[in-house]
Curated annotation (Swiss-Prot):
Top EC class for this record: transferase
Organism expressing this protein natively: Staphylococcus aureus (strain MRSA252)
Annotated active site: 118 (proton donor)
PANTHER family reported in the protein's UniProt record: UDP-N-ACETYLGLUCOSAMINE 1-CARBOXYVINYLTRANSFERASE, UDP-N-ACETYLGLUCOSAMINE 1-CARBOXYVINYLTRANSFERASE 2
Ranges that cross the membrane: none
Pathway note: Cell wall biogenesis; peptidoglycan biosynthesis
GO annotation, cellular component aspect: cytoplasm
GO BP terms in the entry: cell division; cell wall organization; peptidoglycan biosynthetic process; regulation of cell shape; UDP-N-acetylgalactosamine biosynthetic process
Protein name (Swiss-Prot/TrEMBL): UDP-N-acetylglucosamine 1-carboxyvinyltransferase 2
Amino acid sequence: MAQEVIKIRGGRTLNGEVNISGAKNSAVAIIPATLLAQGHVKLEGLPQISDVKTLVSLLEDLNIKASLNGTELEVDTTEIQNAALPNNKVESLRASYYMMGAMLGRFKKCVIGLPGGCPLGPRPIDQHIKGFKALGAEIDESSTTSMKIEAKELKGAHIFLDMVSVGATINIMLAAVYATGQTVIENAAKEPEVVDVANFLTSMGANIKGAGTSTIKINGVKELHGSEYQVIPDRIEAGTYMCIAAACGENVILNNIVPKHVETLTAKFSELGVNVDVRDERIRINNNAPYRFVDIKTLVYPGFATDLQQPITPLLFMANGPSFVTDTIYPERFKHVEELKRMGANIEVDEGTATIKPSTLHGAEVYASDLRAGACLIIAGLIAEGVTTIYNVKHIYRGYTDIVEHLKALGADIWTETV
């Protein structure tokens, strides 16, 4: 069967500007959250990625009028109807689990297929389920392909998350906005995307306090009205382009960025010796290799993002000694390692830690196992000698708006082919 591949001829120096898209991890929660509104919602600044289109079509399955035009989405929930969603759309997208919290909040009942997305080892939704149960929901998991969640009444509850989880924090917020009384989430995730979703819900009339701290309080309301809302910029896309610029850029400028959201990466760049100039909503970066070797450990926000440990890896081949990358969030998130070895990389992984030694990469045929692995392989291809061919690029398109066109505009020798 024919498939699209990305091809890169490495060695070009990049320069120019990139406008960073809206945050994928906000958009995939805010779009399901629109079904909680009674009336019209307009979202602006959405990323133009396949996940957004999938979620919009799930809204349409609930008889919601939804019009997606570029980065804008208009939603009218006036004729909303509950419906079962155990279908292939749900399976293709992990963030479809936000439909659970939103539908539970709106209808007190939902039947939904089990979510898919990037295969990153164990990513259970037990904390989500714990939260739903605390609010009064009963869960039927007897089916292997779908889940039924139902509540006679949703009542506020005190919920302590056993582990910090962005998905569970947001999903509980979605389910709790219409619950009677107060819901308190302890050990809540502090990510900017959690704050963004809370701000969106608040713009519709929800009563949420403490988003961005470890304790979030939600006082249930009777109704949420329509709203217009602008999604925050994507800190992971920004971080990926920062890594691209540090690898092979000369005067690359990134616009529409919140510097505070990428502070940990900027600090790591200072350690490496990358030239970084931070302004209000833009960052300028120059390649300044060879770099200093560093240690990186992923942590929950505001620590180093797990989503950036793969994109930063190719930079470490340009360092003057061995670097170590430990992923404490997803210790199995190292499927890119074998692909990098095909390109001549001196890299080994053992129990969640990669040892990365200075290497000269050459073009090869490689396979993107997940979204951020795909970003890593693109950066590796940009600095490699010869042509790199990346297969399974659908993962890359799930999270990066027009990445091939953006890189072409910066001067990269990159193109797509059908094989």
